[in-house]
Amino acid sequence: MNNQQLWQRYQDWLYYHGGLDFYLDVSRMGFSDALVEDLQPKFAKAFQDMVALEKGAIANPDEQRMVGHYWLRNPALAPNDGIRAEITEPLRQIKAFVADVHQGNIKPPTAPKFTDLLAIGIGGSALGPQFVAQALAPNFPPLAIHFIDNSDPDGIDRVLNCLKAQDKLKSTLVVTTSKSGGTPEPRNGLAETKAVFEAQGLHFADYAVAVTMPGSKLSQQAQTEQWLQAFPMQDWVGGRTSELSAVGLLPAALQGIDIQAMLDGAKTMDEATRVRELRQNPAALLALAWYYAGDGQGKKDMVILPYKDRLLLFSRYLQQLVMESLGKERDLDGNVVHQGIAVYGNKGSTDQHAYVQQLRDGVPNFFATFIEVLHDRQGPSLELEPGVTSGDYLSGFLQGTRQALFENQRDSITVTIPEVDATSVGALIALYERAVSFYGSLVNVNAYHQPGVEAGKKAAASILELQKAILSTLQNESGPIALEALATKVQAPEQVETVYKIVRHLAANDRGVTLQGDRQFPQRLQIQWRS
């Protein structure tokens, strides 16, 4: 295409939403009118699937669950009064609780106010709040947020030691988020945090808040120990779509972020993505572009390039939303399909000095998504040269990279928002949630369960049970024992490698296990309990 033809294609496929001042440009994706026509029946079904989902149909058949994250920003859509109350009442409670914390009505025993917030969670209970905090938290928030989002002891120590070093532990509110209350990572982070608080002479319940399912293990703990408050999670909201539930709204509000604006932005985008006309539905346009890029089989990766520091974590947030939703072995008919779209990214223009070299000249196994923010900063900008600011450079880098990629037959999408505010962030969340839903329908997969994650949890649990058996066996041995003999004694003769990795980890952490012999030849090692 020549420049005039490209300009016409840009206008033909441009989507603009006046209320959000939002643009979506898919013109640099090379799909044809014939493909659009061929996909019309699939999109008709996708639109109908969304109608049924929002009315309360069982959209997650593998777990026999409704999927209701769209109701969170418009409770009137919920299928019954009970579910509406499950949305409106927690939101009211969150706003009241946050106001009391900010005003000092709810405060720690030895400080006038809470100054910091420690959020403990994993997956969507961390990635969403982290993205929103990076994007929207004010420079001087009423509560500065910190995260424990892993079972890494050193990572936990770094967070807690930092709070202790600044004498902030005594004024830190701890919010633990876990749907079941039994997920190991938040459970472990909670236990470690509680131990540190108690070691400092701080009664943990005076600092603790839970976000969990009513009746869960975490809910019971919060009730038994008389924590400050527990906010509910709903069965019909998955972790990766929970940012606009208590999971994300509570930490955001505590930081002083306008959560009502986030909800309103999402609601407005939801309305736009209900339109049953492909060209007038931004989420459907995204799904079309994804389908074209990977031939409906995820053959190309999605590279997210936000040209704004505040959106640095958007790619990590989308990584879970897209990959956990769409990465499925089987479709809804039971056929093996191995679906999914790999997602990665960082930020522009940093990435132009990193992997964009490969994007332009290397393996063409991707499509790019540029996130453009029109407003540069609050206040005037310095002219670095006549008529040119640093924001002009950033915009030029985006446009130049888009053009350079296109010249080498690399496809790209451009999403444009006016500024990084609560309304736009809420709209972005809603846009990609709906695009994932549409794409899941196009390729006929259940986008709302995660059997692979559950398989990993079960495997980890079996390894920990094996570790217990190894420790018990070693403690009852009178002397050193060979690795293969140990594996046989714990009834795991086919798992010698796993047994080896368990004892190596125990030995490295002074857990009473010693390894004797040449580490280059693990099969020759002798294992012994050091009493």
UniProtKB/Swiss-Prot annotation:
Instruction: Enumerate the Gene Ontology biological process terms.
Output: gluconeogenesis; glucose 6-phosphate metabolic process; glycolytic process
| Top-rank EC class of the record's enzyme | isomerase
Reaction catalysis annotation: alpha-D-glucose 6-phosphate = beta-D-fructose 6-phosphate
The pathway it acts in is:
Carbohydrate biosynthesis; gluconeogenesis; Carbohydrate degradation; glycolysis; D-glyceraldehyde 3-phosphate and glycerone phosphate from D-glucose: step 2/4
Q: Does the record carry Cytoplasm as a key word?
A: yes
Check the record and name the CDD domains matching this protein.
Answer: SIS_PGI_1, SIS_PGI_2
Classification via PROSITE patterns: P_GLUCOSE_ISOMERASE_2, P_GLUCOSE_ISOMERASE_3
Q: Where is the active site?
A: 324, 353, 457
Q: Which compartment or compartments is the protein found in? A: Cytoplasm
Q: Which GO terms describe its cellular component?
A: cytosol
Any GO MF annotation of the entry = glucose-6-phosphate isomerase activity
EC annotation?
5.3.1.9
Which branch of life, at top level? Bacteria
Name the InterPro entries on file.
G6P_Isomerase, Phosphoglucose_isomerase_CS, SIS_dom_sf, SIS_PGI_1, SIS_PGI_2
Q: Where is the signal peptide?
A: none
Keyword field contains Isomerase: yes
Q: Tell me which SUPFAM superfamilies the record gives.
A: SIS domain (SSF53697)
UniProt keywords (A-Z) are: Cytoplasm, Gluconeogenesis, Glycolysis, Isomerase
The protein's role, per its UniProt record: Catalyzes the reversible isomerization of glucose-6-phosphate to fructose-6-phosphate.
Q: Which PANTHER family match?
A: GLUCOSE-6-PHOSPHATE ISOMERASE
NCBIfam families reported in the protein's UniProt record: PRK14096.1
Q: Which family does it belong to?
A: Belongs to the GPI family.
- What is the name listed in the Swiss-Prot or TrEMBL entry for this protein? Glucose-6-phosphate isomerase
Which organism encodes this protein? Synechocystis sp. (strain ATCC 27184 / PCC 6803 / Kazusa)
